[in-house]
Design a protein with these regions (language model features):
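Generic detector of solvent-exposed, compositionally biased contiguous segments
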Residues: 36-75, 126-159
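Active-site beta-strand-loop-beta-strand hairpin of nuclease catalytic cores
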Residues: 77-82, 232-242, 267
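Nucleic-acid nuclease catalytic cores
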Residues: 94-98, 104-150, 246, 253, ...
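Mg2+/Mn2+-dependent nuclease catalytic core
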Residues: 238-240, 248-267
């Protein structure tokens, strides 16, 4: 289980890692507004991930300890001189504080993660602060242990050592934007095999990026048939059924192959099983090449997953 860390050196390490990973085009003298306040500061726009960010120190007040505030705003276009804050992640400078939503957690190996309690302020009228948990049900939610032994659930935003940290943070900002705008949660697809529940936290975060990239590629091909099932084709048979192997562990691969084989036996020509596997695992693997269904390789191009052979697999 992940544990909440409050040691100043760990928090400083987390802040330095965030500041080192977050780049972007600077925009100075920007007026940032939120419900009940505003400030003027410099922000940085990460164009490829559609958000801007800024760090601001916050003094102790109203029983809340001094903290680092990571201000975030959704920005598919270059920021203007006035921007609205989509959300902020507050991290105590030392110790732990359940009154703020930002959390730094560590795994058994000492790797650090940026996490969020899931309580989301500033939402629309009628939205519960706990409603974000329901909205982002497919997020990477994990049990965490506090120094006093209490346990709670937190959303893992990103592993702080991940080369894809910025992309994961952008994904979080977009999720918050959609939630606060009152958009419906993305429905779960009935045409994707459910992932293993025991996969590592790092793998689970990467899996969401691969899922999102696959979704975009299928959308480009006009393959979506409606709001109820994101992966349904417009009455076309066979329907694709995807199983994703995110990191290539033997048990994960066995589950994916077994699930596709069973689904194929049950549904016959009505489905087209497609295995999605890392190129590092799939390239030159005779066993995967011998499978009775297509294997699409994915590889990382920067922070984006790209797929080799997807069109051939869809066409059969």
């Amino acid at each position: 289980m992940l544990r909440v860390v409050g040691e100043p050196r760990h928090i400083d390490r987390a802040i330095k890692r965030l500041q080192g990973a977050l780049k972007g085009v600077p925009a100075r003298g920007v007026r940032l507004t939120w419900r009940g306040g505003e400030l003027r500061t410099a922000i940085h726009w990460t164009r490829d991930d559609s958000f801007w960010w800024a760090f601001e120190p916050r003094r102790a007040r109203d029983g809340i300890a001094a903290r680092h505030a990571l201000l975030l705003g959704y920005a598919p276009d270059p920021p203007t001189k006035r921007e609205s804050i989509t959300c902020e992640i507050n991290l105590p400078r030392a110790g732990t504080d359940r009154k703020v939503a930002g959390i730094v957690v560590a795994d058994a190996n000492g790797a650090l993660y940026l996490a969020h309690s899931g309580r989301m302020g500033g939402a629309r009228s009628g939205q519960r602060k706990a409603g974000f948990r329901e909205f982002l049900a497919d997020g990477v939610w994990r049990k965490v242990t506090w120094p006093d032994g209490e346990e709670s659930e937190a959303l893992i935003v990103a592993p702080l050592d991940s080369p894809r940290l910025t992309r994961l943070l952008g994904q979080f900002v977009d999720s918050v934007r959609r939630f606060k705008a009152g958009e419906p949660a993305s429905p779960r697809s009935g045409l994707c095999v459910a992932p293993m529940q025991v996969e590592s936290t790092v793998t689970a975060c990467d899996r969401r990026l691969v899922d999102a990239a696959l979704h975009e590629e299928l959308a480009k091909r006009g393959l979506f048939g409606g709001a109820h099932d994101l992966f349904s084709l417009r009455g076309v048979r066979p329907q694709p059924l995807f199983a994703l192997v995110a990191d290539g562990r033997a048990d994960e691969l066995a589950l994916a192959v077994g699930s596709l084989s069973l689904a194929s036996a049950r549904n016959g020509p009505d489905i087209r099983p497609i295995l999605i596997a890392p190129a590092s695992l799939a390239d030159g693997d005779a066993a995967l090449d011998a499978l009775p269904f297509a294997c699409v390789r994915f590889r990382w191009r920067g922070a984006r997953a790209v797929f080799d052979g997807l069109d051939d697999a869809l066409e059969g």
